[in-house]
A protein has these predicted regions:
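A glycine-anchored, Pro-Gly-centered beta-turn/N-cap motif
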Residues: 218-220, 284, 321
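Aromatic sugar-binding surface patches on proteins
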Residues: 205-211, 306-324
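Core beta-strand segments of extracellular beta-sandwich domains
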Residues: 267-269
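Short, ordered, surface-exposed loop/turn motifs in non-cytosolic proteins
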Residues: 280-286
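Short aromatic-acidic-glycine turn motif
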Residues: 245-250, 288-306
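Acidic/polar low-complexity surface segments
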Residues: 1-15, 301-316
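Substrate-binding clefts and catalytic carboxylate motifs of secreted carbohydrate-active enzymes
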Residues: 1-262, 274-278
Length: 328
C-alpha cells in the first residue's frame, strides 16, 4: 500500500529525483500537463528548471515535497512565475503510514502508530522543521536553535526522509552535563555565531539555511547570532535552562464548555519549571482523574510514534516532557 511505496521512495530518494527529471518522467507528465490548467508534481522538483525552460507556459505546483528539499524548491518558486507554490508533506502528524518519518530510537518499545513526519506533532507542538520552513519562506527573521535529544546521546536512531531532524527547542537536559550535544541553527544569514553563557563556542557559514555545532552541555544560556557578510549581528535567538523545581503544568485552551456533548477542550500537559520552561528529558507515566458528571475524558496521549498505550485510558507516558488530554 501507500506506506510501502513511501518507504521505497525514501530508500530510492536520489534515484527518484533523477528519474522524475528524465525522459520517461517527461513522457508521463506530458499528457496530464496538456489536460490540466496546473500540473501537480510529487517529489519531482528535478523537473522545475527544465520544464520552466522547455514549457514556459506550463503552470506547475509542488503538490508533495520533503522539508529537506525546501531551500532548493523555494528558490525556484521565487525564480519561476509559472511555479506557483510548494506543499511540504506534512503539516500535522497523523495516524497511519507508521514511523516513515520518525527518528526512532530502539530504546522506545511499542507498535508503530503515528507517521512521525509532521511539522507539528500530534499534540499540537510546532517542531524544529516548522521554524526551518518559516525562515526559508522569509516569515521568521530570528535564527532558531534546535538541540538533538540528549537523553538519547550515544544512540543511533533509525531516520526517516520525511523528517530531516529530531532537534527540539530546549537547552534543559538535567543529568546530562558534559554530554556532547548537537545543536542545529537555522538562519537566513551569511554565518552563525554560537555562544554558551556568553562564551563563543564557534562560528560557521550557513549552508542551505542551516549550520550544525557540537558543544558540551552545561546549564545556562545558549545563544545563536545570525551574522551578515561583515560579521554584523542581524538577530539572535536564545535557549535558557529550566530551573531545578519541577511542576506538572496544565494549560487548558478554555475554561468553559458548551453542554452539547460535542464541545472539546484541549489541555497540554507539560513538565516545567516555575516559569513554564519545558523539561523534555522527563518521560514518565501521568495519570489523570476527571471530577464531575458534566465532563469526561475524550482522549489522552503523547506524540510518541511507537507506543502500546491507547487514547481512551486515564494514564499515559509523557514524551519529551509533554502530553495532551482532551475533555468533552
Amino acid at each position: 500500500g501507500s506506506a510501502f511505496f513511501n518507504a521505497m521512495a525514501q530508500k530510492l530518494g536520489p534515484l527518484m529525483f533523477f528519474m522524475s527529471g528524465g525522459r520517461k518522467g517527461d513522457r508521463a507528465c506530458f499528457g496530464a500537463a496538456q489536460a490540466l490548467d496546473i500540473l501537480g508534481l510529487n517529489y519531482a522538483s528535478s523537473r522545475y528548471d527544465a520544464d520552466a525552460e522547455k514549457y514556459p507556459n506550463r503552470m506547475m505546483v509542488g503538490t508533495e515535497t520533503m522539508v529537506a528539499d525546501l531551500p532548493y524548491n523555494w528558490e525556484r518558486v521565487k525564480k519561476y512565475p509559472q511555479l506557483i507554490g510548494d506543499f511540504v508533506w506534512s503539516a500535522w502528524d497523523y495516524l497511519g503510514e507508521a514511523c516513515i518519518g520518525d527518528w526512532t530510537y530502539y530504546s522506545y518499545h511499542g507498535l508503530p502508530l503515528f507517521a512521525g513526519q509532521g511539522m507539528i506533532d500530534s499534540t499540537g507542538k510546532p517542531l524544529a522543521a516548522m521554524y526551518f520552513m518559516q525562515i526559508v519562506w522569509g516569515l521568521r527573521k530570528k535564527p532558531f536553535i534546535g538541540v538533538r535529544p540528549l537523553n538519547h546521546a550515544g544512540e543511533s536512531p533509525s531516520t526517516g526522509a520525511w523528517q530531516f531532524t529530531n532537534a527540539v527547542d530546549s537547552w534543559s537536559w538535567q543529568g546530562y552535563e558534559n554530554t556532547l550535544a548537537v545543536a542545529e541553527v537555522y538562519a537566513d544569514a551569511a554565518s552563525v555565531r554560537l555562544l554558551l553563557n556568553g562564551n563563543e563556542v564557534g562560528r560557521k557559514p550557513v549552508k542551505r539555511y542551516r549550520a550544525v555545532f557540537h558543544v558540551r552541555y552545561q546549564p545556562g544560556t545558549l545563544c545563536a547570532q545570525a551574522l551578515d557578510e561583515n560579521d554584523r549581528v542581524l538577530s539572535e535567538h536564545s535557549l535558557m535552562t529550566a530551573g531545578q523545581e519541577t511542576y506538572l503544568t496544565l494549560s487548558p485552551e478554555k475554561t468553559k464548555l458548551r453542554a452539547n456533548g460535542q464541545d472539546l477542550c484541549y489541555i497540554p500537559i507539560e513538565f516545567t519549571d516555575g516559569n513554564g520552561c519545558l523539561k523534555p528529558w522527563i518521560e514518565q507515566k501521568i495519570t489523570l482523574t476527571v471530577h464531575g458528571a458534566a465532563a469526561r475524558l475524550a482522549g489522552f496521549g503523547s506524540a510518541l510514534c511507537k507506543t502500546d498505550e491507547i487514547f481512551d485510558k486515564t494514564y499515559h507516558d509523557s514524551y519529551r516532557g509533554r502530553a495532551l488530554a482532551v475533555l468533552r
